[in-house]
Amino acid sequence: LDYTYLGNWKSRAGNANIEPELLTAWLRRRGVDEALITRALHQLDKAAGDSSKSLYDRNRAVYELLRYGVKVKPDVGENTVTVWLLDWASPLENDFALAEEVAVKAADPKAYDKRPDAVIYVNGIALGVLEFKRSTVSVSEGIRQNLDNQKASFIQPFFSTLQFVMAGNDTEGLRYGTIETPEKYYLRWKEEAATGEAPAWAAADNPLDRELMQLCAKARFLELIHDFVVFDAGIKKLCRHNQYFGVRAAQARIRRREGGILWHTQGSGKSLTMVWLTKWIREHCADARVLIITDRSELDEQIEKVFKGVSEDIHRTKSGADLVARLNDTTPWLLCSLIHKFGGKDEGDIEGYLDELKRALPADFRARGDLYVFVDECHRTQSGELHRAMKTILPSAMFIGFTGTPLLKDDKARSIEVFGSYIHTYKFDEAVKDGVVLDLRYEARDIDQYVSNPKKVDEWFAAKTAGLNDLAKAQLKQRWGTLQTVLSSQDRLEKIVEDILFDMATKPRLMDGRGNAMLVSSSIYQACKFFELFAKTELAGKCAIVTSYQPSPADIKGESSAEGLTERLRQYEIYRRMLADWFLEPEETAMCKVEKFETEVKKKFIDEPGQMKLLIVVDKLLTGFDAPSATYLYIDKQMRDHGLFQAICRVNRLD
């Protein structure tokens, strides 16, 4: 790596995350005035040592100074000067150094002092910390040591400048995270040598050496800090290897003005890949503007949420006319546009969207700036039509398609024809192997098979209770003794409800309140019928419907019937009753609070699964990066291809 070795600092006094002598010496060699050095160091020390702020806020303040330079005035009345603490443009011009056994005093006098195994200093600023373990000791021990060190009673202030927090051993290799990264989210770097190349790391004796050489090579280390760090709504995040190589590949395409497709599987961080690529475009392409197009309101909301979470203002266009007006102006630089509903049609009405765009086009229309168009979920059937029409309206724009689902044969041919070849791929099996997502277990259940066969009922009971002791089985048998009668007499939905309730009583994660489940129904009406059935069981108050439906008196106009409630009336009544019971208020006022209801039940489903065990859905919550994860997914709906893949990805996330 060619770092300078600073020595063993076990007995050295005053070890800190900012070593003033080293930083001052580097700045002097750069020709920075002494007064500016003093002021810049003061600002850096102040940001890093502000004990009134959380570690996250201190670290973010330091990162801003490293990334964008320290703004100082040489004297009163003089213009502001930027003092750069790192040379981003020429990485090899920085002083990379390593100290081992860096003894740091604990914040609490009663606590033990700590001694990180190795600290990476760049120009005297601690940017990386490493804990090494023997090959017989798990890397997890090193990760937990890092997490302990960040506790307020130990050496938390030392971490205010750190970007990489790492642990490793010779057999398992290196794991990396950043400040406050939970153990399960520590990452492993993965890289293959390009054809015909023989990098130095390829000859490394063990995975630890190889991954250190890949991750901590001078240029790579600074590039990762400069281009691939994000502070996302209270959580600092680093990129995974697939995000890094995906963005790098896209950068190369952009330089050549060639579009293409980024296919990164569900759950592998596609939204942040979009953020990092967008930020790079803005900094490296003159007059750059980025437009992100989606065809689902949930995706549109989520894209706005993720960009605002990383402090980037994004304008959500209200209509096709609004989009045209914004493109015809020089601001804003970042926009997202939903293919809106038109004439009562569903979301994703491409024809209506394009018609409105064309009607809104002034005679002299020309999109201002250098425009880059991202099309989310580009595998969908209509993306070709959209792309061709948008290309006519925006002839000089560059298009990049994003997808997280496997492209089937027809979709693949169409998507490649429309957007160009793959820029980068990261597939489901790779993500499972890397531990980014979990593999799935699938069980097909045919409820009707039990109706007339007592033997099947006994087999079903035996399979369900495998692993339970005799006492537990006896108690369940007593409770479910009438199961054969129940299954023989009830209609199909009631049988599904009984089946799920049995799981709630026998599956460990569902029994102990740590797990939850989603039931995918074929229609909103069927979802309401399911809810009505569950409301009569022990899941009452712990079950909710989340769909796109919003009860309105207009929905039931002309629906009265002498033969009883129509489907629409029944759906309307069940929804109103569910909302009224949740908010403990009259149905007339509660029915206007669907969005608030959805927010609250989602939060309870995630944070308190024991109190919200089951969500009944149709399409909503099955797609998008912030759709909640679940332990079990029950599908009572015909699903295939992309929709099925996105749905099952609700149950393979690490959280």
What are these regions (language model features)?
Residues 334-375, 380-389, 599-601, 617-619:
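Conserved RecA-like ASCE ATPase "motif II neighborhood" in helicase/translocase motors
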Residues 204-207, 412-514, 531-538:
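Interdomain helical connector at the RecA1-RecA2 junction of SF1/SF2 helicase-like NTPases
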Residues 616-617, 622-638, 644-646:
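A short beta-strand element within the Helicase C-terminal
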Residues 149-152, 380-398, 651:
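Short, conserved "post-DEAD/DEAH" coupling segment immediately C-terminal to helicase motif II
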Residues 297, 317-325, 338-343, 524, ...:
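Conserved helicase motor
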